A protein has these predicted regions:
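Membrane-bilayer interface helices and TM-boundary transition segments
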Residues: 1-36, 41-44, 51
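Structured, soluble regulatory/oligomerization domains located on the cytosolic or IMS-facing side
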Residues: 35-182
C-alpha cells in the first residue's frame, strides 16, 4: 500500500518522531521499512504504522528545490517609534541600507521600515524562491519583545547549505537592525 499510493520510496527522507526515525528510507519490505537515521542508526518501522498513522516525508521539498525558513527575532518594544522625515532620510542614507533608496517608503514607524528593508533584501537574494510565499510580519508581542517573523523559502535544500544560508541572512539582519534605531 505504501508503494501503490506513492507514500514512500527508497531514498525518501522521512521523520516519525514517536519511533525516533529521521533519515533516508533504505528498504521497503512487506512488513517493515528500514530508515537510516542521520546519526547512522537504523530504525525499523512496521509498515502498518506508516499506512495507518502520520509521518513527514520531505520528498516534495527536495523535488521542488524549496525549503522553508520560518524564524523570528525579538525587537525591544520601547525602541519602536514613529519616524520623522529627517530620521527616515538619515536611516536610508546609510550605505548598508541602499536597498531602501529605490522603493517607495510608505511607513510610519522604524519597525515598519525595518520590515520593508528585510523584505526587499529577501526579494533581491538569488537563493530565495521568489515564486513562493515571502513574508516579514509582526507576531503577538511577548514579555521578550515584539517578534518579527521572516517566512520564506530557499532553493538550498541540502542541510549544510541550508544552515549556512540561514546563518548568512540572519547575521545580516542582526547586523542592520540597530541602524533602524531598534
Amino acid at each position: 500500500q505504501l508503494s501503490a499510493n506513492d507514500m514512500l520510496r527508497p531514498g525518501d527522507w522521512i521523520e516519525l518522531d514517536q519511533l525516533g526515525a529521521n533519515g533516508a528510507v533504505q528498504d521497503i519490505g512487506l512488513t517493515t521499512v528500514k530508515v537510516l537515521n542521520f546519526d547512522n542508526t537504523i530504525t525499523t518501522i512496521p509498515t502498518y504504522t506508516l499506512v495507518s498513522g502520520a509521518f513527514k516525508n520531505w520528498r516534495y521539498m527536495i523535488e521542488h528545490d524549496a525549503r522553508r525558513i520560518q524564524r523570528s527575532i525579538n525587537i525591544d518594544i520601547k525602541t519602536v517609534h514613529f519616524l520623522g522625515e529627517d530620521e527616515k532620510k538619515a536611516i536610508i542614507s546609510q550605505p548598508e541600507l541602499a536597498l531602501l533608496r529605490d522603493g517607495e517608503l510608505n511607513v510610519g514607524t522604524n519597525v515598519e521600515l525595518f520590515q520593508q528593508y528585510t523584505n526587499e533584501y529577501f526579494r533581491q537574494h538569488d537563493d530565495v524562491c521568489q515564486h513562493m510565499t515571502l513574508m516579514v510580519r509582526q507576531l503577538q508581542p511577548t514579555v521578550y519583545g515584539l517578534p518579527v517573523e521572516f517566512y520564506l523559502f530557499t532553493s538550498l535544500t541540502e542541510w549544510v547549505s541550508y544552515e549556512q544560508f540561514q546563518t548568512e541572512i540572519f547575521s545580516h539582519i542582526l547586523s542592520v537592525v540597530s541602524l533602524f534605531n531598534l
